[in-house]
Amino acid sequence: MSAFITFEGPEGSGKTTVIQQVAQKLENQYSVVLTREPGGVKTGEQIREVLLEGDDMDDRTEALLFAASRREHLVGKVIPSLENGKLVLCDRYIDSSLAYQGYARGIGIEEVKSINEFAINGLYPDITIYLDVSVAVGRERILKNQRNQNRLDQEDVKFHEKVVEGYKKIIHNESERFIVIEADRSIDEVVNATYESISKYLEKL
């Protein structure tokens, strides 16, 4: 059984930790492929380094690079995995571009969506898990955990508040695709809630 499940959330939502632990739980029942964006394949990882560790760049260039990395990732990893009946869990996907570049950068959600629709060629997630946490809590976690901060982490509070606003708009418009998980709880609680939600969805397939 194949399914494409993406994970989204603002910085400090615990997304990467949650997806890894949820994947371990799901592996007891399913053949799971865990991947991430930007990255996931060699070319995608090279673009990731430019995007997250490089110097400041034009907003539209940033959006185009994310879309290019996404296309390489789909063709090289996601699509083959789905065709082989895998359960694909992806750390970030198109909604990140819409929230970060489309809304927070001010390019426009519809403009960035058009770029990405060309890249994904109709391959939307079956469901998207959104880990909902406030900007204040997210930034506090990043500082507490002493996580290496990339170029996007270092944006100011207003930028990250806009990211959350952008996500909320996207979720409002596509509520049937999203499962919203309160992520201001302990990691164990968030992992369990996420695992239960995904399991319920998969049982219906």
Swiss-Prot record:
Show the Pfam families listed in the entry.
Answer: Thymidylate_kin (PF02223)
Origin: domain of life: Bacteria
Where does the signal sequence lie? none
> Coiled-coil region(s) at which residues?
none
Example of a GO biological process term: dTTP biosynthetic process
> Which PROSITE patterns does the record associate with it?
THYMIDYLATE_KINASE
In this UniProt entry, which cysteines form S-S bonds?
Answer: none
> What family does the Swiss-Prot or TrEMBL record give for this protein?
Belongs to the thymidylate kinase family.
- Protein name, UniProt field: Thymidylate kinase
Q: What is the lineage of its organism?
A: Bacteria, Bacillati, Bacillota, Bacilli, Bacillales
Q: Which gene encodes it?
A: tmk
